A protein has these predicted regions:
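A polyanion-binding, active-site-adjacent surface
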Residues: 2-206
């Protein structure tokens, strides 16, 4: 008999809700075949809560299998082998599938169908999680509530969120996209203060 987590994995892999039952009507259905990408684990203590897969991840089926992933792994202080070890990290984007591009060629936001259907079930199936890394605004809004502080304000308050008495602390991070390279240069405290604590925490929970 499959355990509950494995059954949930298979349900998510079969999900086509954004194609077959889009929230805003069929004119807004997913323009391509969905390919849900998520990594759920009964052992990993760290949950990486991302945004949505990009095209390269859609093609490979591996989360963060791109330049953003390379930067994220550098932030975490882990190599690819450790990053894709289910016993170390669970990876649960806000939208499981590549949402497509907008008119300017940028990735669309995560599909709105995913989180209401799957997120609470997925989180409940992983009660061992001790830290959520909330990457980008969509994940931060879900896990922290709407902050109205922008990325700088939210990530800048990382100590407040990480060293909280909550059962599962949340550490907000900017998206590791190249588009945020300018922000990283303007905010040197991120590399000087936050990243050393992040790496120590990752080593403790996933080392």
């Amino acid at each position: 008999m499959r355990d509950g987590l494995e059954e949930l994995r298979q349900e998510i892999a079969r999900c086509r809700i954004c194609r077959d039952a889009p929230l805003r009507g069929f004119e807004h259905r997913m323009p391509h075949e969905p390919r849900p990408v998520a990594v759920m684990s009964a052992k990993a203590k760290i949950l990486i809560a991302g945004q949505a897969p990009g095209l390269r991840v859609h093609q490979s089926g591996l989360p963060f299998d791109d330049a953003s992933g390379d930067r994220l792994r550098q932030w975490l202080g882990v190599d690819r082998q450790a990053f894709y070890d289910r016993d170390r990290f669970s990876i649960l984007p806000m939208g499981f599938c590549f949402p497509g591009y907008d008119a300017k060629g940028s990735d669309l936001p995560p599909r709105r169908e995913c989180a209401p259907v799957w997120r609470q079930r997925a989180l409940a199936a992983m009660p061992q999680i001790e830290l959520v890394l909330a990457i980008g605004g969509y994940a931060q809004t879900y896990h922290l509530g709407r902050q109205n502080a922008g990325m700088t304000g939210t990530v800048g308050n990382w100590r407040q969120y990480l060293f909280t008495n909550a059962s599962t602390p949340v550490l907000p991070l900017p998206h590791p996209s190249w588009r945020n390279s300018g922000w990283l240069k303007k905010n040197p405290w991120f590399e000087a203060e936050l990243l050393p604590v992040l790496r120590l925490t990752v080593d403790r929970l996933a080392g």
